[in-house]
């Protein structure tokens, strides 16, 4: 099922009846007799066919008057990977909405980023999703708020701003109008304290209550709700105000006397999930002072705090500490892309498993392509990593961050701004220069966080941010071990990005970005392919000319012609080949 296909009722009903995990996030099941919508994997009894409607996107279900199920929790659905394969304008727009562009700049700003008119964007969204971009952004805010209310004890004020609302009043009114209950009511019945109260009363064996789909939760979720009128986008009165967030009044920012907000969220994914290989990849490339990784998890500094990502049963646990919760929505979106949580491993394995990669696919089920937390950061990593080892690139990047990076918080724990001591040139020269993509990862039995001798992380974890394009364009990069040509390439990359001539964000057009990258002296097909693969999330990107890929293909007796047979999953084929070494 691709985003361009019309939903077939019989196919969707069979998938929902079987609770087929492969369709989670690809469509939603709405029930007219209850007025709520579910994921295809909802564990309750399948409703009668006459009462069922299917929608491509949660926003379309909400625009038709349905509320999210409190049992299967649609806010936990992984994203639809079909949009990455299609690589079209709607998919790029969805990624920008996830990053909060519509919240901050409205639909006009979103359309401007995509170089189309608002009318054209609305027409595409309505045709493909059944709801306009404004409605999609609104649903994203509501579902994130629902997850925060259910999983955390974050104050409702902080929940409002973390989800992207401009005020608590707006948050209360929108949730009441869309879902039929106030935020405080949801927390009372479904929040962490309510769950704790319910936990000590298990039902005796043989006395389980019968399940009926959509019957969980209070009466508000059991009563049918009539379809609410909306405009062509499925938007509601007041959505225009929701679409732009100025300086939110009443937002609480952490101060030196008040610790930053700490919370934990579930990030669901489709099984299987090869966390070990992905974390090993990130650990080998962890930049000193900015990030740390081990086989048990990953953490890094972010604006106003830090994040920790830990694999768990069926999901990844995201632990966040932030000065300002308004950054949370973008962080969640970027973490999902970094860990490739929206991929469909079964579909990828079915396609690649029918080729010469059959043995590799069977060896590493659920292999993911590591993404990027920031597009510009990934581009710099790729340029610095040209013709040097992974360890050498990591050393050079650590020096760049130590010189040009900024603290995640104005005053880190302990006072002052302690920067990592850049390694000596001898450290870099001790590692033989080979292709960066072919280096081995840390041993599987390692259990400690990767903490380079360069320092900078300390007991409180990483606290330096990667320099922005504007900052790197002005930074002095001499004396760091970079060649003059490499410095010139980095400066040109930073200047073009800072000037808006080069878009490296998730919503960029891969083909257009690749063409602009190739215009920069010092950036060739390998660097471009690597950036498009990881920063722009193109599942068919191929780092042409990579020595490690050639070596692996020769060792496995795979012909060059086979590369074309791996479409549209060549990025995953590359990861399988790199991992085979």
Per-region residue spans from a language model:
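HhH-family (HhH-GPD) DNA N-glycosylase catalytic core used in base-excision repair
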Residues: 1-223, 229, 244-245, 249-581
């Amino acid at each position: 099922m691709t985003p361009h296909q019309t939903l077939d009722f019989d196919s969707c009903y069979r998938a929902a009846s079987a609770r087929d995990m492969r369709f989670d996030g690809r469509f939603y099941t709405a029930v007219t007799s209850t007025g709520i919508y579910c994921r295809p994997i909802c564990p309750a009894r399948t409703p009668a066919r006459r009462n069922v409607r299917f929608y491509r996107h949660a926003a379309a279900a909400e625009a038709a008057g349905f509320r999210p199920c409190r049992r299967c929790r649609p806010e936990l659905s992984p994203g639809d990977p079909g949009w990455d394969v299609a690589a079209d304008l709607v998919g790029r727009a969805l990624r920008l909405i996830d990053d909060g562009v519509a919240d901050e700049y409205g639909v006009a700003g979103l359309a401007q980023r995509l170089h189309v008119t608002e009318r054209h964007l609305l027409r595409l969204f309505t045709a493909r999703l059944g709801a306009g971009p404004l409605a999609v952004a609104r649903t994203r805010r509501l579902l994130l708020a629902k997850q925060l209310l259910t999983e955390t004890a974050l104050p409702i004020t902080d929940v409002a701003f973390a989800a992207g609302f401009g005020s608590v009043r707006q948050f209360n009114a929108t949730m009441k109008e869309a879902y039929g209950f106030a935020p405080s009511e949801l927390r009372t019945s479904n929040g962490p304290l309510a769950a704790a109260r319910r936990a000590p009363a298990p039902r005796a064996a043989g006395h389980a209550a019968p399940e009926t789909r959509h019957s969980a939760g209070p009466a508000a979720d059991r009563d049918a709700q009539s379809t609410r009128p909306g405009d062509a986008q499925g938007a509601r009165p007041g959505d225009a105000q929701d679409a732009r967030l100025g300086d939110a009044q009443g937002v609480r920012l952490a101060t030196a006397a008040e610790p930053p907000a700490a919370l934990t969220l579930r990030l669901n994914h489709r099984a299987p999930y090869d966390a070990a290989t992905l974390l090993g990849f990130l650990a080998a490339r962890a930049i000193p002072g900015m990030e740390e990784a081990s086989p048990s998890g990953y953490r890094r500094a972010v604006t106003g705090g830090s994040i920790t990502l830990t694999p768990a049963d069926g999901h990844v646990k995201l632990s966040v500490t932030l000065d300002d919760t308004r950054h949370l929505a973008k962080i969640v979106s970027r973490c999902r892309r970094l860990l490739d949580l929206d991929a469909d491993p079964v579909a990828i394995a079915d396609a690649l498993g029918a080729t010469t990669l059959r043995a590799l696919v069977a060896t590493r089920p659920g292999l993911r392509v590591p993404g990027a937390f920031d597009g510009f950061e990934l581009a710099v990593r790729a340029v610095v990593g040209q013709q040097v080892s992974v360890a050498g690139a990591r050393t050079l990047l650590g020096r760049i961050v130590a010189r040009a990076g900024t603290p995640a918080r104005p005053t880190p724990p302990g006072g002052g701004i302690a920067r990592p001591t850049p390694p000596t040139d001898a450290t870099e020269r001790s590692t033989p220069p080979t292709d960066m993509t072919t280096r081995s990862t840390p041993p599987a039995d390692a259990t400690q966080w990767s903490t380079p001798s360069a320092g900078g992380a300390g007991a409180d974890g990483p606290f330096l941010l990667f320099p922005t394009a504007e900052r790197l364009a002005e930074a002095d990069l001499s004396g760091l071990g970079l060649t003059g040509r490499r410095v010139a390439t980095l400066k040109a990359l930073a200047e073009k990005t800072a000037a808006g001539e080069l878009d490296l964000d998730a919503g960029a057009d891969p083909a257009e970005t690749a063409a602009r990258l190739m215009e920069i002296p010092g950036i060739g097909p390998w660097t471009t392919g690597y950036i498009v693969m990881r920063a722009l999330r193109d599942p068919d990107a191929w780092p042409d000319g990579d020595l490690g890929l050639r070596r692996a293909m020769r060792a496995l007796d795979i012909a060059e012609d086979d590369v074309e047979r791996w479409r549209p999953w060549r990025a995953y084929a590359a990861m399988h080949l790199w991992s085979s070494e």
